[in-house]
Amino acid sequence: KNEMLFYIGKKTCSTYDLNSAIKTNNYNVVNILLANIKARMFKNEINKEDILKLMAAREWAGESDKWTKASGLYSAIVKGYTEIVAAWMETADVIASHYENDKDVVRELLSLSRNNAVCSLHIASFKKMSKQVIDVYLNAAIRLALQHGFTFDEIVEQFTRDFDGKPFSHVVNNGDDIHMGLWLKIFKIVVGENENYLKDVMMQLEEKNNEGKSVISQANGNPVLKELFWKAVDEFNFPQEELNRLKQYRSL
């Protein structure tokens, strides 16, 4: 309680304050600090660069610290702090709306899910991560991108960077079930949010390799990927015509 009163009394917050509160999973203090950033933004007390720096809440400790230079959001995702990720993404939404004609602000906010060049949903961390935190992050991140006019190609580019630079066809070709599952989740959310992107998603799913073999046929050749793919398709909220078209591949 005293700690909360201390932060409420502070006129400004530093990147260290927010990073520290996130790392200790102190949801109440995180909320106070995020509210502080929004209030100062609306009063024009801080500029865009400072807002993004505060939202990054990067670790600044010595090299021995595991989270050196990691953003607060990255730490929260990897540690599975679902409530904090949700609160951070809600604040990101408010900031993006404040700078509504500036797509780079959205790009910058979404890039904070990465630890420098390393993605948040890194394969090494993913197996230990809470699936709930991934759902919360992806749903909020994709919604944010779509609300601010990202094209399908821009969404793919954004999340390819999140996934170690691996596009959908590449992960299927490599038998990478972890990243394939993440891509299928993204396709489901994108179409659920905006059916205009259905055609783009279908093109990704039906893409053919040099030998004329479709991505789905490749997935069918791997028992793990096959099970993962058709389980995801069964959960897709696609129009019946497209679902029927996909299901023709089931026996191939």
Can you describe what each PLM-predicted range is?
Residues 2-11, 32-58, 86-108, 136-154, ...:
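Ankyrin repeat domain, specifically the short helix-to-loop turn at the C-terminus of the second helix
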Residues 4-9, 13, 20, 26-32, ...:
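Terminal export signals
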Residues 10-20, 50-75, 105-125, 154-173, ...:
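Ankyrin-repeat boundary/"N-cap" motif
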Residues 25, 80, 128-129, 175-178, ...:
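Ankyrin-repeat intra-repeat helix-capping/turn positions
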Residues 205-252:
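Leucine-rich solenoid repeat scaffolds
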